[in-house]
């Protein structure tokens, strides 16, 4: 018992003598803003399918080449009166190449139009992604970045217009589903 008390006292004394390092030359600032509610996406554009169609893999001449432009829009309503402009951000999995393009996926079942083997195996196209552009100036809208800002009218409505296109992300594009 005496041994435990002496050991505990020695440990306590060691901790009291231990040096402490404090940094006094740095400052952390937290900044932010509490905003009004957001605009609402209209029901006719909240869940939409943008058909890019069937495109030959030979339509792509190299990395960055584009095919099959398709226009689509996202309409907003009930925007707060304090807002004068709106933008959207698209999210998803980025295509290989890291240029802000959306990766294409694999169909869920072999009955989907991705089964080009006849074996019941679902196949996704490779070497291709989906690139989104602002229709107003044809600038790219990269994943997780704001689109071009669109004016909100006096009724609290706005329509943001875009173009989606397939983009070659690799020199070799293979056939398959490109959803």
What are these regions (language model features)?
Residues 14-17:
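Short, Gly/Pro- and small/polar-rich lid/capping loops
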Residues 2-8, 19-179:
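Mature extracellular/passenger domains of Gram-negative fimbrial/pilin and adhesin proteins
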């Amino acid at each position: 018992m005496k041994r435990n008390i002496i050991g505990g006292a020695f440990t306590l004394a060691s901790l009291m003598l231990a040096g402490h390092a404090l940094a006094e030359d740095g400052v952390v600032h937290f900044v932010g803003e509490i905003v009004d509610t957001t605009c609402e996406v209209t029901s006719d554009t909240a869940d939409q399918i943008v058909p890019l169609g069937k495109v030959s893999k030979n339509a792509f001449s190299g990395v960055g080449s584009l095919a099959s432009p398709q226009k689509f829009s996202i309409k907003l309503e009930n925007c707060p009166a304090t807002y004068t402009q709106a933008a959207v951000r698209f999210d998803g999995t980025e295509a290989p190449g890291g240029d802000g393009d959306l990766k294409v996926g694999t169909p869920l079942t072999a009955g989907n139009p991705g089964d080009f083997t006849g074996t019941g195996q679902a196949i996704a196209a490779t070497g291709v992604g989906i690139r989104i552009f602002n229709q107003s100036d044809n600038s790219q809208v990269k994943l997780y970045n704001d689109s071009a800002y669109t004016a909100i009218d006096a009724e609290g409505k706005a329509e943001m217009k875009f173009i989606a296109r397939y983009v070659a992300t690799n020199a070799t594009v293979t056939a398959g589903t490109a959803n």
